[in-house]
Structures are given as structure tokens and as C-alpha cells.
């Protein structure tokens, strides 16, 4: 297809230039002495436990956009512990409705959902920054599910407007939620700043006294309504059982010592103490000052005789931190040390975990950091110390010990040249020694295995592959209880996962050319530039909250037609390689041609990136990839500029083919599984030490796929003949694997994976798994059925559109599915530059065009009966309202019905914003078909459902692909 270039061009090797990427395997890792960088040390004392792993720093603000956005695999993998979202009918943002997404959130690792109650208001600051008066009359005397409930007319009724807003919000949540006890209500957001009660830290100000009075009335009203539902006075789906509603506050934009002191004293006297104490730590300075703020707060509790209250930093970090694992680990370690919850700030759009995922279903490096952090659930944290404690942009870490699985983990990153933040390329090639003490031989035995994985920064929308093993130590003596593990950091913005286990019955190796997993990396500003392309030096400190981090603190711009970036690279082995470019643009898809040693080698197709505000243009970076066939030795890879005028940050060259001709082979050992419901790592069976024993539970793996299609999944395990386990992919049972022999063996099956992150689950009883290996098997893609949307039966408002500037296959696609919004052109002022903004009525409700619903029908017999992974290539540029800094995007809904438009719904999904209607992404759904016709559209009644997808508007469609979830039989092999 025209949008996806899979051609491979054979290139003959030239002279050599070695680009180092990782550390050596052996009994002791050695730092790269050529770097000339001073070694930094992170001290980890496993003998000093600091408490249960809290896991609260994986919170987000508006990290979820709607039910299904993000997809389950992304959400479950990230283990988002808490999230703050908007209230039902809230108009501050058009998506992120708590009720719409609660079931998905709580079924994928979520524990606590908070409601920003003031986000009921459409404007920022709320109500123009002024405390509301009594200027509206709200409709409250009808059932909560009546469409008129909560609407208003101008003119007062003797009741404070916000009191009525509170009643609306709490009633809508408690009447409809299925998880009332897991909600927290936040009545005020940044009251000390521009929202109604601004007085800085002046606790004597009259307006602050007004705030205290309003806090009391809000708190008591929330509790009153809670009791009405708990006692059954008001009808609800599920009755609350907790003694009282969880309320959080005060919600200041920074830590305020005087206001916090006065607030605690007052709230204690009035019995209105919050269940969660909330403030924000947004600036980079917070990496230095948070611990002192936290200590000051706890001293206030002691001063007033208050038992410790949970703390949630409901907004943390800047754009320079989001998607950057070496930054995120610094925040997470700080919050985990103090056992508090914390939520990444909401700087861009809802539904992408605060820029910590890529595309529609892929990981960026921020996602892998969230995933690693979430993997620590159930463990005990231990003491970690750094020479740079309370220093912004420095080496920090988290360490934990899982005694059940005999696994010790250290997450670390942020190493920086003598903390000199203005130095170009600071942080690259710094050797970091993790000094481990207190390793208990009673737990680990006399020798251990160690693996270190590297998670390198790829930009907010750049795809990050499964982190590679860059250091491995096998059968290392720990008789002294001490071990030093030194790894050279490729990038100060990378993070690292170090795992220690008892010596295992498997062969450890680093991901290098011998393993078919080599990776070569270069900053584009270090390549040879010509044709007007220029290097732009960046400072990691940036110029405020809206600064995006740049790999290597520099990038290349002015990259236009005639420009070339030339990279001389030494390829370690013959084979296929994936050339990835981290790049930003102006909000439209485009292409860059690639040549190798002067020969045309293909084209990289870049998708559009976020560009609706000046801070994001060219700087909100994604990635594009092309496959190259290269010979061992030196080559010159050239990227050619075009009219796209994109910026370039980093080049990466991934080895795709291994010596056995397997493609994109990734081995996931058992210590990388997430083990649940009784499954655990065991070390007491000879020949199976370090295997995951299922024990009636399950082993869960989050596997990366560069593209949708068939992948072989090979499971190596021990079992007795006849023992079985069930393999599920993305929540769908695929097959039962039954052992055909006794002892060590493997079973392999070809399954359909989606582009991005896939959740693989193995459940069973008497089976112990050593590892799971995935490999691309494109030959089986011939089993898929691909249907161009414009070739199908269109009805209603659905129509074909031609657009030569799009990245749709054949440059044509279908628009008009479902209903359609009434839209108007918008310029940069409304952050709708190059997009169309949905028109709102006086109640800030989107206007829906009076037109026939559009549908696309796949004729009967086209798709046989069966279970399929349905890949949808779509675009969505829906944009509702204006905001000072948040692009007001929404997800759109697509449903599939069996037989006719009135038939049974067999699939449903939320489809994210794609930056432009001409920019198409992939998202997959599982569908079970009967062989009848399939009708695609959006039949939701506008405004009736909870979330934005319920407005009845569908995305644009390029094509749909139906992959049978499994092809062929299970292939077994005895390894005994």
C-alpha cells in the first residue's frame, strides 16, 4: 500500500565507523573508559526496607480521554494508580468524563478516581477567575437522568451558584457510578492562584477567610449528599459503603505554608478536614524543594494534633518531563520515597497519559517508565541514596524487593555531567555504578544473575521499542552481600531497569548483533548537514512549562527541499535494519526520502504531529521508520529534506533480522512477566530455576509490535504431558496449549498482534514458563482480509474524499460516519490552527448537524464467521471549544453491527485525535463475526451517553483489515 513502504534495498558495505550502544556482558560490567566521564554512584541498601511499594506516582490528570482511550493494553501496562478527571457534564474540557471511563480505569489497575469539580465551568480561569455569585437558576427538581437536569437560565434564585453546581456534580456521579467508594471529590483547584480566592500565601487576607467558609459549606454538602445515597434516600446503581465521601483539598498551585497552616487549624475545628491533602509541584525547582515542602506539611499536622492525612500532588512536572524517562524517574523516586500519590500535569490533550504514550496504541519511553514502576506493585521498597539528593536533573532511583518472587529491582536515571545543566550533550556516556548492599543469601543464594535494560528517550509521539538488555552478569558471587553493577548511560534522558534474581536456568546475554538486537544511535545534529539544514542548540532548562525536551540538547531545523543529513554508521552484521527518525512537523503528514551509499533506499512516511500551539510546532516529535537491507561494514545513510519542513532530533538503527533469519525477535524472560493470582517465580526445581509457575494464576506480558500482523509467539516451559495453559491476546482467548511431552519443551503459535502494545496472558496450573519469544511472521499476513473503505457500500452521510496531501492509502478515504458536528474554521488563537472547531450552543453543548447517519457496510460473505483482530485505519480532527493551553480534542466512536444497522453490536471503540483529518493512525478491536454483513457507524444518541464518543460522530476511515486471531496449529518441540 502506498502509505507503507516495505521495500528492502541491498547495500554493499563501505569503510567503518563504530557507534557504541551499551555495555559488555561478563562477571563484572566495565564502564566505557573512552567516555572520559566521571563515574556516578547510586547506593541501594536492600537490608533497609522503607515500606510497602505505594505506586501512587503513576497518577495522571486527564490521562484518560474516554472509554477505550487509551486502549486496555496501554492502560493496564502503565498501571495508572490514580487519575483526576472532569465531572459529568463538565465543560472545561470536552473529554475525560470520569463516569465514561471509570469501568475501564478500575479494571486495568486503577485504584482511585478524582473529580475536578470546578471543571464544570468552561473557561480558564474558572468563571473568569471570579467567585460566582447568585446569577443563575439551575434545574434541580427533575430526576438526575433527565436531560434538563443541571441546565440553567440566567437570573438568581437565592442560592450560591457553586453550591448548586456541587449538587449537580455529586448527584450525577453518585447516581450513576458503579464504584462510589473509589471516588475522591476535589471542590477547588488552585484557589490560591487565579481561581476565586487568590491571595498567594497570605492567610490573613479577607478572600482567604471566604475560602475557608466556602470549604466548610462544600465539604458538608458533599457529605450530606453522600449519606443520602448511602442510606438509599436517592436511587443509585451502586450504594456507597464508606462512612463518608473522600474529599481532597485545598488544592493550591504551589505549597503554601501559611495557608496550609491556617487551613488545617480551621478544618480541624470545624470537622471538615480533607481525606487527601492536595497541592501542585509543577516547576523544575520542585525536584529540589518537594521533600522540604512535604516535611513542613507533616510538621503542621503534628502541630495541630492531626493524624497523618494522605497526600496527592495532583499536578506535577512540565512538558520537559513528560515522555522523558530520565526525568520521570526523578519525580517518581521522590514521591515514592514519601509514599504519596502524584499525577502528571495536563499540558496537552486528554487520553494519552499526559504525553506518556505514542500514536494510537504504542509506547513511548515514558510509557515504559510507567510500566516498570507499575511492575513493582506488591514489593517492599528499600533505601536508595544518591550524591545528588534534592538536586534537579540528577541521578535518582527507586529500589524494591519482591520476596515472594525473590526478585530485587532498581529503577534509575538522570545521570548528568557534574550537574552542569547548560552543557551540550551532558549526560551521554556517563558510567553509573549501582552499589548494592544487603543482598540476603538466605533469599538469593550464594550467586545471582543481573540484567540491566535501557529505556531511551524517543520524544512524546515517537515509538519506543521493548527496552534492550545492555548489561548482564551471570552467576555472580554475593557472599559479601554486596555487588557493584556499572553501566554506561547512553543518554541522560534514558532510564534503566536493573533486576537481581537467584541464578537462573537460562542463558543471559545482552541485546547485541549476535542476538539480532543491536541498536545504533546518533544525534542528528552530530551528522553532516548540507543544503541549508542547521543545528539548533537547546538547553534542558528550557524557557518555562511549555518547553519540550530535546535529545542531546540539540536538533536540526531548516530541513527543507535540498537539505541532507548524512550519517556514517558501522553496521555490525548483514541483514535487515529499521531506520527510525525522531522528527517534528507543522501538523501535517509528509515524507523524507532515504538513500544509502548514494542509492535510493526508500521513503519514511511521517504522520502529522501536534502543532496547534506555537510551543508544539516542530517540537512535539514523533517517529517514522523504513526498513533497509545492509551488509556488514560502513555505510552512509542520508535523509533528504522535503517541503514538509520537519525538524530532526535523533537517528536510530535497529537490527531486525537475526542470524537464524527471524525478524524482530524479542525474548521476554519470566522475570519480565507480571504474575497474578498465585503465579510466581520459583527456584527450587533443578532445570527450572527462575521459571514462572502458573499455579492456577496467570503470567501477563506486554509485548511491543512495530506493525499490525502475524507474530509467532513461542513459549518455553516445563510441564508434564497433558498439562495445559490458555493463551489470550488483548483480552481474547486465542488457544489452549497442551504439553505433548514431559519436561522442558516449547510451543509456538502464530497470532495477530496490533501495532504497538499487546497484552499476552497465559493461565494454567501445573506449567512453569521460562520465557516467551515473539517474532514477526509477515508471510501469514496473506490470511488477512483488507478492505478499502471507499470500495464498500456507503449510505447516509458517508462519502468518499480524495486528498493527495493525506497519508491514506490511495489518497482517498471515507468521511461522514455517524452524525457530524457543526464546525467552523478556527485560527491559532483558539488553538485550532489548521483544524475545524465544533460550534457550541449557549450551554456549551456541541451542535450536531441535522443529517442522515453515515454508515459503511461490508457485504455478507466478505468476512467469514470467526474471531478477528479488526485493524481500523482512521483519522479524527474533532476539536471542541477553546482553551488557554489545552487542545480541546475529543475521541470519536465507531461501532460494528452484525447483519444490518439495527443488528447486534459486535464491537465498539474510541478513536483518538490524529492532529489532522488527513493523518491516519491504526487502532484495533476484537470482533466475532457470523459471516453476515457488517455495518460500521456510530449510533449513539448525541449527548445521552457519558463520554465524548457518545455524541454519535464517527472517525474518517481509510481501510479495515480482518486478521483471524490465530492461523495454523500449535507447533510443539521437546527440549528435554
UniProtKB/Swiss-Prot annotation:
Activity at various pH: Optimum pH is 6.5.
Residues forming the catalytic site: 190 (proton donor), 315 (nucleophile)
Disulfide bond residue pairs: none
UniProt domain CBM6: residue ranges: 519-654
Reactions the enzyme catalyzes: Hydrolysis of beta-L-Arap-(1->3)-L-Araf disaccharides from non-reducing terminals in branches of type II arabinogalactan attached to proteins
Keyword presence, Secreted: yes
Temperature remarks: Optimum temperature is 35-45 degrees Celsius.
Enzyme Commission code: 3.2.1.223
Domain of life according to the entry: Bacteria
Signal peptide: 1-28
GO MF assignments: hydrolase activity, acting on glycosyl bonds
Main location: secreted
Role: Hydrolase involved in the degradation of the gum arabic arabinogalactan protein (AGP) and larch AGP. Catalyzes the release of 3-O-beta-L-arabinopyranosyl-L-arabinose (beta-L-Arap-(1->3)-L-Ara) from gum arabic AGP and larch AGP. Also cleaves a small amount of beta-L-Arap-(1->3)-L-Ara from sugar beet arabinan, but wheat AGP cannot be used as a substrate. Can also release 3-O-alpha-D-galactopyranosyl-L-arabinose (alpha-D-Galp-(1->3)-L-Ara) from gum arabic AGP, with low efficiency.
Protein name: 3-O-beta-L-arabinopyranosyl-alpha-L-arabinofuranosidase
Protein species of origin: Bifidobacterium pseudocatenulatum
